[in-house]
């Protein structure tokens, strides 16, 4: 290989400048590996969209060069896009046991085989083309999270994945500090590190702190306790179970994703539940309210989640009763604040006692704060640094932290999705771009909804639609019947008869003018109807409904 080829290209396809859809490609010569393949949930204006996944055009164009996919942990923003990726790129997928356990459920739902998934554990070594990878245990808000040591012909890259330094983890499995330090002694060319909490000073509290809060709440609660949390936070679920056992309560689990993760975690040994503690939700009526704990989804106020349906008095099996204690063991993801607030309000209206503030100790982050981030840098001591996993301000703040530790600014690169970051032994910089963006998933459709469709949906949601049906004579364009106007989401027709009659007149005038000018092309006729009617409606209502002309010829 020539000297000009002694470079590694690092290509983030998602996860930079945003929270979610984490995916990064590493390329050396004709070999590509992929780290993570996550999704993100739609923004508020993405009407009707279920999921957002990264654009993998670059990977499809280089499909024959992709050697393997490596997963850092089992959160949706790191594995959620894999069912869509694996349908098109069939390569080995490596992850820890719990990560693959959760993934296999997703693959089954999407009709994708899990035969090419391979379990790894910290300390294992895997070769994939020119890359040799090692794996280190880290703490996060899900068990079995790992960081990656990626050996390349250019040098050693450390990718932290999502991490925090929890000195008292629930499962007793602390971060492998010694491994990071050993790599630091060996010499690390590039560190790629989690930036989510780069703005937060100090240290992220231990997960065990939440367990102490559960103990306090369980001790004094006189009726049922309902705890909403992320289904993937197995350590938190373990602490809920531990408190339930301590205070002689039975545990019921509600919510599809919660039930799935609990079953997988028990099967793989990550969740330890004494026999007889777990009961079906239908059995809760056989016990006193003071003997019951319900673990549920819905900590983000998701409209169809179990807790939201309970709060709306719309759940088939659980009715919120006065005196119930509801603990929301999570903080709202940005954009979900209103949904969570509405759920809390509705729970209070039903007479529940709701515990939800972070200051009450019912939630801690799964990401490193500034002092832990500094410790990671000091353990690894990289030559170059690239902040990852965060919105742009998080990346900038993380870069500033690295500089405060003595990293030269020219040795830091703040990338963006689609940037080709070229790494050599002596330099790092952005050398080009590849396609990167958001692929929208709507039902079974992947990528068939774009900006134009979203624009139409937004217009429909804001001002409604007006359908104009008119029949014209083929040669003269004279009106034979109609125009008839059907309105949905614009005005209630019976209360706006004058407006509708005048609207019909405007359509007639537009078509008469076209006939006078011998215009017979359908596209022109439809455009004339849209323009004339649109101007009139805006003048009268200051609204712009979607206007859909339907012209029939006889």
Stretch-by-stretch model annotation:
Residues 2-70, 75-286, 305-319, 338-342:
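His/Asp/Glu-rich metal-coordinating catalytic cores
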Residues 16, 40-44, 65-66, 356-359, ...:
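A glycine- and charged-residue-rich anion-binding loop/surface
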Residues 92, 386, 548-549:
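Short glycine-rich phosphate-binding loop at a beta-alpha junction
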Residues 107, 402, 537:
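Conserved hydrophobic residues forming the short capping helix/wall of the S-adenosyl-L-methionine
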Residues 121, 416, 543-547:
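Short Gly/Ser/Thr- and Asp/Glu-enriched loop/turn motifs at secondary-structure junctions
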Residues 199-329, 333-358, 362-518, 526-527:
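Hard-cation-handling environments
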Residues 518-554:
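C-terminal tails and terminal domains of large nucleic-acid-associated
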């Amino acid at each position: 290989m020539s000297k000009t080829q002694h470079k590694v290209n690092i290509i983030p396809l998602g996860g930079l400048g945003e929270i979610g859809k984490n995916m990064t490609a590493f390329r050396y010569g004709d070999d590509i590996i992929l780290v993570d393949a996550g999704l993100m949930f739609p923004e508020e204006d993405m009407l009707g969209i279920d999921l957002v996944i990264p654009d993998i055009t670059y990977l499809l164009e280089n499909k024959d060069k992709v050697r393997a996919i490596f997963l850092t942990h089992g959160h949706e923003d790191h594995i959620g896009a894999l069912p869509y990726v694996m349908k098109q790129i069939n390569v080995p997928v490596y992850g820890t046991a719990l990560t693959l356990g959760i993934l296999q459920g997703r693959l089954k739902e999407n009709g994708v085989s899990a035969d090419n998934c391979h379990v790894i554990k910290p300390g294992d070594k895997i070769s994939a083309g020119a890359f040799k990878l090692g794996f280190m245990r880290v703490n996060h808000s899900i068990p079995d999270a790992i960081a990656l040591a990626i050996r390349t012909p250019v040098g050693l890259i450390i990718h932290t994945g999502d991490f925090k330094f929890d000195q008292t983890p629930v499962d007793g499995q602390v971060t492998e500090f010694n491994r990071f330090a050993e790599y630091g002694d060996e010499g690390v060319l590039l560190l790629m590190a989690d930036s989510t909490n780069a703005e937060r000073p100090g240290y992220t509290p231990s997960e065990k702190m939440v367990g102490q809060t559960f103990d306090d709440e369980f001790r004094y609660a006189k009726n049922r306790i309902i705890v909403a949390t992320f289904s993937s936070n197995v350590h938190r679920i373990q602490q809920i179970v531990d408190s339930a056992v301590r205070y002689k309560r039975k545990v019921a689990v509600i919510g599809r994703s919660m039930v799935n993760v609990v079953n997988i975690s028990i099967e793989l040994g990550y969740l330890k539940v004494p026999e007889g503690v777990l009961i079906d939700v239908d059995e809760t009526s056989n016990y006193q309210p003071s003997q019951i704990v319900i673990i549920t989804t819905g900590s983000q106020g998701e409209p169809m989640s179990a807790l939201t349906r309970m709060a709306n008095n719309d759940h088939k099996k659980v009715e919120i009763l006065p005196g119930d204690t509801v603990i929301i063991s999570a903080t709202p993801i940005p954009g979900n604040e209103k949904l969570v607030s509405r759920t809390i309000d509705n729970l209070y209206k039903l007479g529940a006692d709701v515990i939800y503030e972070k200051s009450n100790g019912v939630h801690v982050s799964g990401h490193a704060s500034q002092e832990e981030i500094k410790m990671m840098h000091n353990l690894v001591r990289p030559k170059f640094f690239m902040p990852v996993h965060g919105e742009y301000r998080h990346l900038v703040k993380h870069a500033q932290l690295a500089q405060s530790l003595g990293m030269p600014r020219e040795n830091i690169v703040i990338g963006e999705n689609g940037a080709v970051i070229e790494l050599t032994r002596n330099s790092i910089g952005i050398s080009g771009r590849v396609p990167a963006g958001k692929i929208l998933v709507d039902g079974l459709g992947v990528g068939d909804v774009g900006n134009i469709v979203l624009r139409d949906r937004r217009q429909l949601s804001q001002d409604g639609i007006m359908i104009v049906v008119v029949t014209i004579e083929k040669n003269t364009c004279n009106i034979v019947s109609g125009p008839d106007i059907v309105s949905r989401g614009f005005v209630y027709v019976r209360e706006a008869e004058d407006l509708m009659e005048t609207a019909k007149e405007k359509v007639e005038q537009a078509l008469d003018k076209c006939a006078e000018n011998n215009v017979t092309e359908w596209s022109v006729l439809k455009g004339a109807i849209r323009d004339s009617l649109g101007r009139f409606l805006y003048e009268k209502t200051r609204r712009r409904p979607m206007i859909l002309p339907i012209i029939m010829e006889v």
